[in-house]
Amino acid sequence: MENFKHLPEPFRIRVIEPVKRTTRAYREEAIIKSGMNPFLLDSEDVFIDLLTDSGTGAVTQSMQAAMMRGDEAYSGSRSYYALAESVKNIFGYQYTIPTHQGRGAEQIYIPVLIKKREQEKGLDRSKMVAFSNYFFDTTQGHSQINGCTVRNVYIKEAFDTGVRYDFKGNFDLEGLERGIEEVGPNNVPYIVATITSNSAGGQPVSLANLKAMYSIAKKYDIPVVMDSARFAENAYFIKQREAEYKDWTIEQITRETYKYADMLAMSAKKDAMVPMGGLLCMKDDSFFDVYTECRTLCVVQEGFPTYGGLEGGAMERLAVGLYDGMNLDWLAYRIAQVQYLVDGLEEIGVVCQQAGGHAAFVDAGKLLPHIPADQFPAQALACELYKVAGIRAVEIGSFLLGRDPKTGKQLPCPAELLRLTIPRATYTQTHMDFIIEAFKHVKENAANIKGLTFTYEPKVLRHFTAKLKEV
């Protein structure tokens, strides 16, 4: 099979979910009712759902079977210990707190790390800044809710869709150190390493870059949190693109990766393949005080620390899913599927970010150059794609980035991208071909697509619930 151009999906489909087909008129009415916001569409009105890969894919038979072992004890559940053991074996982290999903971990650790920096280093809350290669939207939101400004320090190649570069998710190391010196190290409560970098197009971060980032963090005694939603995809890219690790297993690369952080926060709904779940973990005893404080907050916000908002069966499923998500054949297929979609779109003249791990990112700014950034070209493209083919995608651009919480002005966005997110083991190559054909129709009418303006704008994470209309 090594010489075949395309390999089929490396799994058998045993259970199916019927979906309905709708008319163009029906879809036009539905998107207007949703306030031109695909997040607000009913799922039954969506033919192909590319909104997110978070908890929307299939699970493996071993994960499903593991649920039957669930211990639903309120405290001290053996299912918790099974999960904690998986974390120790895979990441090498000693302390585990389960959460209902990634943002559950964020709402716990962010205030704890800010308080710790304030007590130990005299952090000035009016001047505090956290750094990342690129903050995920909810991490940014939780930071801002806690009064912390965020700053993304990414390499110049990151958002240039005309450039191919192996590790577009990398930190700008000079920019990171310069930023730390500028605000004062004591005013930096944490650094977040996002692997892969979702907002940059699912782009990986090299191990060499993570090592160098961690060295800078240790120089200034700043804690590093690994945003780990797509840890396995990042490890796969390292194996493929970083020569030093080409003969390492995904498991070995993962273990090495997590040496270069102090904590991990994870939405387990991505690479751990579960429909619901998250993790907050600390590496060793040097962060035991943080673990203790986070456990206390977990009780208030998520649940008792040995279940954290998850039933026992869900913890068992997650304990297995962490392993299943690292399967090399599975990762090779998944990333090849994304590459196939990107190649097909570029063949018809639709410019994309280079293929990442979980999605194709269309450069909406280039497809719709007549729509200015403050009229959200990628959001307008998402609405048109739904009208044409019933495909739901998500904007990653100015609409998502939002406003400066201090000035109220729109934050400048490095690129206006439309994310076509591929749920795991859910759609076939035929679906990819249909998506490509849909873009042919969208491209033909591109000049007539209109920009958007708000009719309702929430102050925080506006892209989830905002409503808009055509200009």
From Swiss-Prot:
Its cofactor is pyridoxal 5'-phosphate. The modification N6-(pyridoxal phosphate)lysine is found at residue 270. Disruption phenotype: Not essential, cells do not produce indole. GO terms for molecular function: identical protein binding; L-cysteine desulfhydrase activity; lyase activity; potassium ion binding; pyridoxal phosphate binding; tryptophanase activity. Induction: Repressed by cold shock. Pathway: Amino-acid degradation; L-tryptophan degradation via pyruvate pathway; indole and pyruvate from L-tryptophan: step 1/1. Belongs to the beta-eliminating lyase family. This is Tryptophanase. The lineage of its organism: Bacteria, Pseudomonadati, Pseudomonadota, Gammaproteobacteria, Enterobacterales. The gene is tnaA.
